[in-house]
Amino acid sequence: MMMMTSLGGGAGGGGGGGGSGGGRFVTYPPPLSVPPSAPQSPNFSGGLRSQPSFLVEQEKYLSELLAERHKLTPFLPVLPHVCRLMNQEILRVTTLLENALSQSRFDHPSPLASGGIFQNSRADMNGWASQFPSERSVSSSPAPNWLNSPGSSSGLIVKRTIRVDIPVDKYPNYNFVGRLLGPRGNSLKRVEASTDCRVLIRGRGSIKDPIKEDMMRGKPGYEHLNEPLHILVEAELPIEIVDARLMQAREILDDLLTPVEETHDFYKKQQLRELALLNGSLREEGSPMSGSISPYNSLGMKRAKTRG
């Protein structure tokens, strides 16, 4: 339904005059509504929706968003606002999904939350899908969300890189790479999307296949394979915020690189829960969920093969 608002008559604002020119109407379009495919919170005025049905709808919508974001990757430099809005919607949906999956977030904060990314949200964005090429890096660059940030008026964009060492010498049997990547590389993807930094795992052990790593060692572009396992964090941002974003990413990574006893590792439990959800094997309160609801099983999305 269209809405009409009456604007006052003459400059004096006075009434008077019986003519029809005493006022004018401006027609407004109806407020934007969320598309039918965009699921809301499981709590509606009509009652509580079934948890499994809600999760399936959420994951289906999320897979559509992820597929569209993947298609937008080549256009990030020319469509920054669109990409920023897309990231915000992905965050909204993953927040709802995470709230539905876990009721104990406050008791077990994730490293992402402690890093200050989601200070006003209970979610750590479990549910993102990603595609990552060689050396365990995430493929798509994060969409800039700093366009309207205060203090970015200088227009000077700088590129900076920091290195974060992985303590494999102290904990040789700890699976740091798996903890960093998460299911389908989602955990690393969330760090990238939330900090506007690119995160790459480099060094010995950064290629999944040891035989392939031995083959690539010494070749151009793979010199890092002679170094200990480490992380490179790259940021190309306005000079006013680039250091803050790099430090934000470093703080999150430091948390992820702190070994936790498996029985108390809530973050790993959430990763396993996410993997079960993506594989379609998650069971909520005894309610069966048939079929896979992985984002890769819809819209023709395929997992990217790695060179390593």
From Swiss-Prot:
**Keywords associated with the record:** Nucleus, Phosphoprotein, RNA-binding
Chain positions covered by the region annotation Disordered: 1-26, 284-308
* Segments of skewed composition (Gly residues): 7-24
Q: What is its main location?
A: nucleus
Pfam families found in the cross-reference section: KH-I_KHDC4-BBP, STAR_dimer
Instruction: Quote the protein name from its UniProt record.
Output: KH domain-containing protein At4g26480
Q: Where found, per UniProt?
A: Nucleus
User: Is Phosphoprotein among this UniProt entry's keywords?
Assistant: yes
